[in-house]
Amino acid sequence: MDAMATATQAGDAQAAFAGTLTDKLKEQFDAGLLSGQELRPDFTIAQPLDRYTDTDHAVWAKLYDRQASMLRGRVCDEFLQGLSTLGMGRDRVPSFEQLNETLMRATGWQVVAVPGLVPDAVFFEHLANRRFPASWWMRKPEQLDYLQEPDCFHDVFGHVPLLINPVFANYMEAYGKGGLKAASLGALDMLARLYWYTVEFGLIRTPEGLRIYGAGILSSQGESIYSLDSASPNRIGFDVRRIMRTRYRIDTFQKTYFVIDSFDQLFDATRPDFAPLYDELRAQPTLGAGDVGQSDLVLQRGSREGWADSDDV
């Protein structure tokens, strides 16, 4: 293929990310990783194992050790079981292909490598077909505690172990199918809130107390402590209508965490047709991330200490 054709293909691939072209994606295009030959129509790429540096593996090991040492007694048993079943090691960034050998046998899911955030429709299509799109690249050593977009550690360590659990795996598939429908109904904002407050920042009630299952918490040292120990945030019982009305924070720890009783409760919430629910909720005002209502099942009303004054998403 001549240079002009290659450049045209790369330009077409870059244009496909319109609206989601982050700095990390631009970096990969500039490096030639995402030429038209590399990027598939579903926005996946072959995981470039040969591009991981010693620094990448060291960052993975440091994050893995840090989180694994503090999560026992904080994270739900289902996550620990999934981590053990997958045999996800600490020494190196894992091979997605090797993870998939176990994951496919367990629940029919697989991890697919993507260069970063992908368009909504692509994301939902992957989930609906039991494919979890995971960023292949690792954060830099100076980004251990804060990263603007999800990297491989967040996506793989934070999300993938729970896909071993059949009920949670079913929920994720149902969410993907629901997302495809929500897009056609103009309701992505409401469905995004459900993902945020469950898959990313959810807590679960167990006989031993509250435990973490949300990947955004699991992959963060600070929020792993804050979400369970701090008096600042609200902790409110799960209510799908309430969640779909509630704005959230992307720049600080959460003001509110929603608590499920079980993964069955979470999956059952996705069974009804959401179309009438979207119509109902459009007629109601959205709620701030820290709001507490009279009908809420309040497990703990937050002290509000340290809350940011900026607007919620």
Task: Label each PLM-derived region with a short phrase.
Residues 217-285:
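A recognition module on extended beta-rich or small alphabeta surfaces enriched in W/G with H and D/E
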Residues 177, 181-215, 219-222:
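Extended, Lys/Arg-enriched charged tracts that mediate electrostatic binding to polyanionic substrates
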Residues 113-118, 170-172, 186-187, 209:
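Short coil/turn segments at secondary-structure boundaries
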Residues 152-156, 170, 174, 202-203, ...:
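Residue-level preference for alpha-helix termini and adjacent loops
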Residues 97, 151, 169, 173, ...:
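Non-catalytic, well-ordered alpha-helical scaffold segments
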Residues 156-182:
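Beta-strand-enriched cores of mature, soluble protein domains
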Residues 1-163, 255, 260-313:
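The feature captures two recurrent sequence modes
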